[in-house]
Amino acid sequence: ELYKEDTQKAERAALTLIDGLHENFRKRAGQADVLKQLIADSPYPTLVCGDFNSLPSSYVYHTIKGDKKGDKKGNKKGNKKGNKLQDGFQTSGHGYMYTFKFFKHLLRIDYVLHSPELKSTDYFSPDWSYSDHNPVVMRMKL
């Protein structure tokens, strides 16, 4: 009886965790769709930086960057100039980089994305003891 009760508690806890993660993924996807539209409507060079809490393979990352054709509703509207944003790490970073300190230093979930007109010259993420994320620094040529 005790084993059955413990198993049921563990199952409920796991389902609650999964529901919470799903809700967070859904919220971030909606925010990415809104940001994509703002970027698409802007006639100016764009710089987007922040804690996306999403991997480089995620819907959020690719939507904000402009890699995905359309949002989750199927709307297809790209940047007015037809440009995708570039990932500063890919344009001027070196080697392997993580920004989330836990999970064995495997996750890069903080980004600086920029229009091709903006030129990055250096990109790094120094160790930082004040947060569970390391900051991201990108130098640019103006």
Model-based region annotation:
Residues 26-47, 52-142:
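Metal-dependent phosphoester-hydrolase catalytic domains
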Residues 1-38:
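Catalytic-adjacent loop/helix segments of enzymes that bind and process anionic phosphate/sulfate esters
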